[in-house]
Amino acid sequence: ALALEARLRAQSSRGERWLPAKDFFKGLFTTDLAADEMLAEIALPPLPPRTGAAFIEFARRRGDYAMMGVAVVVTLDGKGLCQNARLVYLNAGDGPVRADLAAGLLQGQALSDSAIEAAASMAADHEIEPMGSVHATPAYQRHLARVLTRRALRTAFERTASTNE
């Protein structure tokens, strides 16, 4: 929801309200919902042409709580350069973490190993704050973030070709 810039509708007996996904998540297992509200709808805006997205998470076993995850959305201009990028991590802080500095490094860049590596390193080394768990140390979570970011960015860039209208 955060990577796709969704809007969320909260409903209660008092009525409804819409809020952007960036304002919905407040911390670890905490949202902006009041005690009498429930999440009733998630509205995803249409993706622009030449946009690709990917979500990758890593867990020890299928269905387990992920040690790290990343959602990536990239939009290319007519020349194949990155016009917009969003990277959002899960289990990288006390809530979903947007890596805006890493996304900024992709702006104006073509798909290249160096651009992907720069973004992955920026996010893993400077933007996320993994807390660790019984399954993964913070250092291992940073390593996972770097690897998953590379994979997700390559997948998202590849998927832009199928939305080239």
Name what the model sees in each region.
Residues 1-165:
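C-terminal structural segment of proteins
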